[in-house]
């Protein structure tokens, strides 16, 4: 009986791993569109970011924002494949948060952009016919939370 349970557990883990790889595949295939759409929605919600004096006002700054969103999406994809947000180093994210603070990048919109990407990714997964994808939320929520936390 114990061997049977072990085999069943292994089958479940294999199926879970395969599903996670499929999710990462959908994210990878659609990454450029996910980021582009999220950035567009973000700047519609926060037009002051791309206005004179905003942190994404120049082409160079805008491109850095897009680059950072790509990094966040990639980190989420890695965490999904790994099976959870534990692979995301909280200290690294806290350091990134401190860097953004020192550069005058508002953290609320960064966290909002990450949440927008989560929503878009889940829409892409639904369109691809994938179900039972609640595990996708964890890395996006974790990064958004750590990035937007403030030290007291």
Each language-model region and where it sits:
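Core of compact, soluble alpha-helical bundle domains
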Residues: 1-101, 105, 109-111, 115, ...
